[in-house]
Each structure stands twice: as C-alpha cells, then as structure tokens.
C-alpha cells in the first residue's frame, strides 16, 4: 500500500510565561459595578412620605361586628352589587344566595374553638342560579329574599364548579338595625 504525506508549513506562536505566573481568568467581571458597603434596609429608607410615617386604623376595635368580604366598606348600593355580580359571572362562577335570621357574623355558641356551628354556615336561598348570564337575575332573587326576610342577613356567594370551591362571598343586605 502506498501512502502519501502532504506537508504544509504551520506557524505557531508560543507565549512562554515564567514558571511561577498563571494567566488570569478572563470571564470575571469587574468589581466596580458591585456595592462596596451594605445599605440600610429598614422601612424608613425604602419609602418616604416626606419624613412622616403614619399608620391608618381601618377597623374599630369595639362595637363593630365582622361580617364578610367588603364589610369594612359602607353598604353597597344596587349598582355596586350589580358590578360585583357581573364580576363573578365574568369569572364563570355560579351565584348563590344565602340568608341568616339571627347572627350575620361569626359567633361561638356551643364551644370556644372554631367549628361547624360558629355562624359560618347559612341557609341557602332556593338553589344556586345555574346558567345565569345576567346580574339582574341575581338581583331579582335578592329582592325576593329581602321581601321574605326583612330582618335577616343575606349574602351572595360565587362558586367555581371546576375547582369545587367558594371563590367570593359578600354581604348583600343587612337588617336596618345593623
């Protein structure tokens, strides 16, 4: 067998450093961009409102019963209730009305620890409004419930039938004495 060799001139450069030196790693960044001292991370240095820090109390500590979501706001009028119901319908939740004749707030009558009978479970008004597409249908049911129980508490709930959970709940009507 015959073999052929082709020779070509090659030029190589060798950088011979001293035996005691090591070439620097070129992938590191300069330390100039990093802070050299730790900054103060307390709340006063993060946000400033002109030097005054004030806290707002949003819930009175006595004389105010805790109800449901939005209960710290003034009572919702019909237009605001319609917007809340439209929101839960847009989310695809099923509206339902519940009422309570005696206690519209969490209370513990039978035991000091939380349980089934502590005011969280109310009586359902009719059936959930399956297939509801308009907020006026729910508000019509609300008016019927108000007429039937003028001294009761009424709340609107939105259920997610896919996750099988209650997603929204708010007081829609309180008796005049509250």
Curated annotation (Swiss-Prot):
<dbReference type="InterPro" id="IPR036385">
    <property type="entry name" value="RuBisCO_ssu_sf"/>
</dbReference>
<dbReference type="GO" id="GO:0009853">
    <property type="term" value="P:photorespiration"/>
</dbReference>
<keyword id="KW-0120">Carbon dioxide fixation</keyword>
<keyword id="KW-0602">Photosynthesis</keyword>
<dbReference type="InterPro" id="IPR024680">
    <property type="entry name" value="RuBisCO_ssu_N"/>
</dbReference>
<keyword id="KW-0150">Chloroplast</keyword>
<feature type="transit peptide" description="Chloroplast">
    <location>
        <begin position="1"/>
        <end position="54"/>
    </location>
</feature>
<dbReference type="GO" id="GO:0019253">
    <property type="term" value="P:reductive pentose-phosphate cycle"/>
</dbReference>
<protein>
    <recommendedName>
        <fullName>Ribulose bisphosphate carboxylase small subunit, chloroplastic</fullName>
    </recommendedName>
</protein>
<dbReference type="GO" id="GO:0016984">
    <property type="term" value="F:ribulose-bisphosphate carboxylase activity"/>
</dbReference>
<keyword id="KW-0809">Transit peptide</keyword>
<dbReference type="Pfam" id="PF00101">
    <property type="entry name" value="RuBisCO_small"/>
</dbReference>
<comment type="function">
    <text>RuBisCO catalyzes two reactions: the carboxylation of D-ribulose 1,5-bisphosphate, the primary event in carbon dioxide fixation, as well as the oxidative fragmentation of the pentose substrate. Both reactions occur simultaneously and in competition at the same active site. Although the small subunit is not catalytic it is essential for maximal activity.</text>
</comment>
<keyword id="KW-0601">Photorespiration</keyword>
<comment type="similarity">
    <text>Belongs to the RuBisCO small chain family.</text>
</comment>
<keyword id="KW-0113">Calvin cycle</keyword>
<dbReference type="Pfam" id="PF12338">
    <property type="entry name" value="RbcS"/>
</dbReference>
<comment type="subunit">
    <text>Heterohexadecamer of 8 large and 8 small subunits.</text>
</comment>
<dbReference type="InterPro" id="IPR024681">
    <property type="entry name" value="RuBisCO_ssu"/>
</dbReference>
<keyword id="KW-0934">Plastid</keyword>
<dbReference type="GO" id="GO:0009507">
    <property type="term" value="C:chloroplast"/>
</dbReference>
<dbReference type="InterPro" id="IPR000894">
    <property type="entry name" value="RuBisCO_ssu_dom"/>
</dbReference>
